[in-house]
Amino acid sequence: NQSERAEDSGNESDGDKDELSTLVEMGHHAPWDIDDM
């Protein structure tokens, strides 16, 4: 997945957060998001 790749890169862009918001909005909370926090 593109978002996973971006996260693996180390949160290079703020756009990742935006994508995350979209995922959460859809109801797909990514587990790696919590781990990153």
From Swiss-Prot:
- Phosphoserine PTM positions: 9, 13
The protein's UniProt keywords, in alphabetical order, are:
AIDS, Apoptosis, Host membrane, Host-virus interaction, Ion channel, Ion transport, Membrane, Phosphoprotein, Transmembrane, Transport
What Gene3D superfamilies does this protein map onto? HIV-1 VPU cytoplasmic domain (1.10.195.10)
Q: Provide the membrane topology annotation.
A: Single-pass type I membrane protein
One GO process term, biological-process aspect: receptor catabolic process
Q: Which GO terms describe its molecular function?
A: CD4 receptor binding; monoatomic cation channel activity
Disordered, as annotated region: 1-37
Protein purpose: Enhances virion budding, by targeting human CD4 and Tetherin/BST2 to proteasome degradation. Degradation of CD4 prevents any unwanted premature interactions between viral Env and its receptor human CD4 in the endoplasmic reticulum. Degradation of antiretroviral protein Tetherin/BST2 is important for virion budding, as BST2 tethers new viral particles to the host cell membrane. Mechanistically, Vpu bridges either CD4 or BST2 to BTRC, a substrate recognition subunit of the Skp1/Cullin/F-box protein E3 ubiquitin ligase, induces their ubiquitination and subsequent proteasomal degradation.
Q: How does it assemble?
A: Homopentamer. Interacts with host CD4 and BRTC; these interactions induce proteasomal degradation of CD4. Interacts with host BST2; this interaction leads to the degradation of host BST2. Interacts with host FBXW11. Interacts with host AP1M1; this interaction plays a role in the mistrafficking and subsequent degradation of host BST2. Interacts with host RANBP2; this interaction allows Vpu to down-regulate host BLM sumoylation.
Q: What else is known?
A: HIV-1 lineages are divided in three main groups, M (for Major), O (for Outlier), and N (for New, or Non-M, Non-O). The vast majority of strains found worldwide belong to the group M. Group O seems to be endemic to and largely confined to Cameroon and neighboring countries in West Central Africa, where these viruses represent a small minority of HIV-1 strains. The group N is represented by a limited number of isolates from Cameroonian persons. The group M is further subdivided in 9 clades or subtypes (A to D, F to H, J and K).
What's this protein's family per the entry?
Answer: Belongs to the HIV-1 VPU protein family.
Q: What is this protein called?
A: Protein Vpu
Q: Which organism is it from?
A: Human immunodeficiency virus type 1 group M subtype D (isolate Z84) (HIV-1)
